[in-house]
A protein has these predicted regions:
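Amphipathic alpha-helical and helix-coil boundary elements used as assembly
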Residues: 1-425
């Protein structure tokens, strides 16, 4: 940046490009190694040039969940690599871009920032025409290759106005003095400052899921949600509080996995990939005073459950597991029609025991029911302890039928002996 001074106003000019800047007016800047104050016109009296071995190649990668198989890798080589290590590579991940089209400009800017002082000159003098970004031609240096075009990237002006005689003692310095210090790069170098470190988030944060008024679930095609952070003073707990934020699920496969979208009002835990404040992700959910667990605790601490809530309603679906000692059970239930499949020790959840309803299984509903099996259906009261055979095994049933057949034969024979009707088989 630099200041432009006019008669009626002063302007602060900021730019992210050097090559679009002007050249200074008034001809070349002169160099003279004479001591300060011994030159009749403004000059640069000190010129120190240095070269530093810096990054010669920049490689960057990044990741986007929208294109997970594409590495978004970009390679750029520096310019003017004389006296440099051409194999000196810097590899950065993440590259701070999510679209490949932005990758090259990011990589280019990063490389230039790392090479900002690969070729640099430090000067001092009293020519006030030096302005950051404005090129000038240097003349008068004993090394001909230094008499070239340069651009200042940093200028420090220092001026002093000493007090008058009436204010200080007779031996106090009088008049004014001015000098400057500047850093220069060759005019053809598109200079960039050092890359700034990315602000890092120290650990996860708590937030509340938000969305439009009247909604209970608000997400996009990726299952992302929006949240309101407790520290946010500007948000209004609506769909504009944050950007879309990804949600971690227990399973996530190709058309398979677990899916449970955080609902508006739920408290969630938000973490940040690589500590990057621009890459939040919901990693968990927590209960709180306004969102209590499905069953009172610690009374029902032996229960494990997955219980949903009817969208814009009050009913629920639930998969419940009861691990009560010697009375374990599982149940799959829906409030619609009071439909349920209960397995094991049949009873309702209870903190201090309850009246048993039976043992085994119960499939029931207040609505209609149907059992269909295209390839056969076996209903039997014969035991098959611990599922020791195939689920359609009919060995025991055949034995019963054979015993019944034998009994029928015996009864037939007995009837024939006593003048009854003979049997058919």
């Amino acid at each position: 940046y630099y200041f432009r001074f006019d008669e009626h106003r002063h302007t602060l000019v900021c730019s992210d490009r050097l090559y679009v800047q002007e050249r200074i007016a008034g001809g070349p800047v002169l160099f003279s190694a004479q001591p300060e104050g011994d030159n009749p016109q403004p000059v640069l009296h000190s010129f120190r040039y240095s070269e530093n071995v810096r990054t010669a190649r920049q490689t960057q990668r990044d990741y986007s969940f929208k294109r997970p198989t594409y590495d978004q890798e970009h390679h750029l080589a520096g310019e003017a690599l004389e006296h440099q290590g051409s194999s000196y590579e810097r590899y950065d991940y993440p590259g701070r871009y999510k679209q490949s089209g932005a990758g090259r400009p990011f990589s280019e800017s990063r490389l230039r920032g790392h090479r900002r002082d690969a070729r640099v000159a430090s000067v001092s003098g009293d020519d006030p025409r030096l302005i950051p970004g404005h090129a000038f031609a240097l003349e008068g240096h004993p090394r001909a290759d230094f008499n070239a075009w340069w651009r200042p990237v940093r200028v420090v002006h220092r001026g002093t106005q000493y007090a008058g005689q009436e204010e200080e003692s007779a031996d106090a310095p009088l008049g004014v003095s001015y000098d400057l210090r500047a850093e220069l790069v060759p005019e053809d170098v598109e200079w960039r400052p050092a890359p700034l470190p990315r602000p890092r988030i120290d650990g996860p944060q708590i937030a509340t899921v938000v969305g439009p008024a009247g909604e209970e679930i608000h997400c996009d095609e990726w299952g992302r949600v929006k949240v309101q952070f407790p520290w946010d003073r500007e948000g209004r707990h609506d769909e504009f509080s944050t950007c879309w934020i990804r949600v971690a699920q227990n399973w996530a496969g190709a058309d398979w996995g677990h899916m449970a979208i955080p609902r508006i009002g739920q408290e969630v835990i938000v973490d940040y990939l690589d500590g990057d404040c621009d890459q939040p992700i919901v990693t968990g959910r927590t209960y709180r005073a306004t969102n209590r667990p499905p069953y009172a605790l610690p009374d029902h601490k032996i229960l494990s459950t997955i219980k949903s809530k009817e969208y814009k309603g009050s009913r629920a679906n639930e998969l419940r597991i009861d691990d009560t000692t010697a009375q374990i059970s599982a149940a799959l239930m829906s409030d619609h029609g009071a439909s349920a499949l209960r397995l094991g020790y049949l009873t309702h959840p209870r903190p201090e025991g309850g009246k048993p309803r039976g043992e085994g299984f119960e499939l029931r509903t207040d609505e209609h029911g149907a059992v269909r099996a295209a390839r056969g259906l076996l209903l039997s009261t014969e035991e098959q302890l611990r599922a020791g055979a195939g689920h359609l095994d009919r060995g025991v049933v055949v034995q019963v039928l054979e015993a019944a057949l034998e009994l029928a034969r015996e009864l037939g024979d007995y009837a024939g002996e006593h003048q009854g009707v003979g049997h058919d088989a």
